[in-house]
């Protein structure tokens, strides 16, 4: 495991996902910040403290891909892990082409999430 605690921001409009992922990450000694929207994440001011962004592709309001594109346009190098419950191949390609570190399919296993974070924040 890492020598310092890693802060992971999670953006998903499903409160059940937010709660489950927060519990899983906290149990694995990660600091977790959760947000129900891309807009809430951007307005929070946490970006400078975040090491990795776990981001749902399909959100109400701005999509996960739009948020990732916005961050990149602002010069952010924040590593992004996309997650989705959709089986849309075109959407998956769009997410991978957007430069994410990993794409997790909901429901995902604990080790898949931890492995993706460790890949994103070596």
Question: Which role fits each region the language model picked out?
Answer:
Residues 15-33:
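Two-component/phosphorelay signaling modules centered on CheY-like receiver
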Residues 18, 60, 88:
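The feature encodes the CheY-like receiver
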Residues 34-52:
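Acidic, metal-coordinating helix/loop segments flanking the phosphotransfer/catalytic sites
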Residues 36-37, 63-66:
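Acidic catalytic/metal-coordinating carboxylates
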Residues 65-76:
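Short amphipathic alpha-helix used as the core "switch/output" element in two-component signaling
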Residues 66, 87-102:
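Alpha4 helix (beta4-alpha4-beta5 surface) of REC/receiver domains from two-component response regulators
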Residues 90, 108-118:
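C-terminal output helix
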């Amino acid at each position: 495991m890492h020598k310092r605690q890693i802060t992971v921001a999670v953006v998903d409009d499903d409160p059940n996902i937010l709660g489950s992922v927060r519990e899983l990450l906290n149990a694995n000694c990660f600091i977790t910040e959760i947000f129900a929207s891309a807009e809430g994440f951007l307005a929070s001011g946490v970006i400078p403290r975040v090491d990795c962004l776990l981001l749902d592709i399909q959100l109400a309001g701005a999509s996960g891909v739009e948020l990732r594109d916005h961050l990149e346009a602002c010069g952010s190098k924040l590593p992004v892990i996309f997650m989705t419950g959709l089986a849309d191949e075109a959407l998956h390609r769009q997410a991978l082409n957007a430069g994410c570190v990993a794409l997790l399919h909901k429901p995902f296993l604990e080790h898949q999430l931890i492995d993706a974070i460790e890949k994103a924040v070596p």
